[in-house]
């Protein structure tokens, strides 16, 4: 066994040309997509920095959980990038994960069928689905073992996109996918 330290989760901050930092609440984004200091109108550079109260760039996980749910926040943290690397918090990422989770819920509402996915298939979409599912199980298993959660989640998203194209879902495949996604 080995101990793994998670990388630091950072946040966006803003700095002037002279490299001094500006608290987030004193910054506005304008129509041109750039960031400006409200008081002076000076254009600022968006940088990645350690979260701090003085910069007011601290993300309160309770607020994120309230908005998107604990499952979305937890999955986003695993999806942000390699576990041991530092990475910036971006609420837009949670929104994307939350949408994917809603897509999984929508798929769960579809009717199940008893098609034998291990046998010979005629339907091209089912053949592709079976192939993608096999790739998903293989990749998620390997990536979970090596703590590469971000790439495991990415592969599950690929499978969810394929699964959403189906009118009904093979029961055995859905049952197995629920087991694969449940730790995440």
Task: Give the positions of each predicted feature.
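A structural signal for short, well-ordered beta-strand segments
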Residues: 3-5, 48
